C-alpha cells in the first residue's frame, strides 16, 4: 500500500465512520427517538464514533506499516510512566466529572450515569491517539517535518 493510499484510507475511514454515526443519530432523533448520553443507543453511538480513529489507525498500521495487532495493543497498553501519574489522571478525571455532576448543567437521572461516563472517558477518551499519533502523524513525517506533520494532524483531528 502506498503512503498516499494509507493517508487517504485512514482519513476516509475515520471521518466517514464519524459522519455515518452522526447521520444515523440525526435520523433517529428526527424520528423521535431519544439518543443521548443517558440511553444505551447514545452510549453505543459515542463508543462507535469515538473508536473510529483507533480502529482505522490499527487497520492502516497492520496493512501499511506491517505491524501485528499484538504489537499495537502492547504499545498502547504498556505502562510507560510512573504509576502515580496514572493515579493523577484518574483523580483529575474524577474531579472533572464531580464538577459536572454537582455544579454543571448535566442532569443525571440515575446514579450510575456518572460511572458510565467516567469509564467511557477512560476507555474511549485516549484511544484515538492510536490512530492520529501512532499512525497518521508518523506517515506524514515520512515526507514532512515534525512541525508540519503535527499541523497536518491537527487540522483533520480538529474536524
What residue spans do the PLM features occupy?
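Juxtamembrane "helix-exit" motif on the non-cytosolic side of transmembrane helices
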Residues: 23-34, 98-107, 159
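Membrane-interface helix/loop boundary segments of multi-pass membrane proteins
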Residues: 127-155
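Interfacial transmembrane-helix boundary/kink motif in multi-pass membrane proteins
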Residues: 2-12, 39-46, 64-97, 141-149
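Hydrophobic cores of alpha-helical transmembrane segments in multi-pass inner/ER membrane proteins
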Residues: 49-61, 91-92, 123-130
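Divalent metal-coordination and catalytic microenvironments
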Residues: 18, 72, 129
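Hydrophobic alpha-helical segments and helix pairs
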Residues: 80-126
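Residue-level signature of the transmembrane alpha-helical core
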Residues: 15, 51, 90, 118, ...
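Alpha-helical transmembrane segments in multi-pass membrane proteins
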Residues: 11-62, 111-116
Amino acid at each position: 500500500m502506498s503512503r498516499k493510499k494509507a493517508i487517504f484510507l485512514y482519513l476516509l475511514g475515520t471521518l466517514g465512520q464519524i459522519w455515518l454515526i452522526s447521520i444515523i443519530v440525526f435520523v433517529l432523533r428526527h424520528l423521535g427517538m431519544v439518543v443521548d448520553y443517558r440511553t444505551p443507543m447514545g452510549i453505543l453511538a459515542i463508543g462507535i464514533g469515538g473508536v473510529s480513529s483507533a480502529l482505522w489507525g490499527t487497520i492502516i498500521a497492520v496493512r501499511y506499516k506491517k505491524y501485528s495487532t499484538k504489537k499495537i495493543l502492547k504499545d498502547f497498553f504498556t505502562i510507560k510512566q510512573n504509576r502515580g501519574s496514572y493515579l493523577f489522571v484518574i483523580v483529575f478525571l474524577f474531579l472533572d466529572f464531580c464538577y459536572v455532576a454537582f455544579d454543571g448543567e448535566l442532569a443525571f437521572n440515575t446514579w450510575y450515569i456518572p460511572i458510565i461516563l467516567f469509564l467511557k472517558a477512560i476507555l474511549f477518551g485516549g484511544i484515538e491517539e492510536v490512530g492520529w499519533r501512532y499512525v497518521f502523524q508518523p506517515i506524514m513525517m515520512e515526507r514532512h517535518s515534525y512541525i508540519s506533520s503535527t499541523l497536518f494532524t491537527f487540522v483533520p483531528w480538529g474536524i
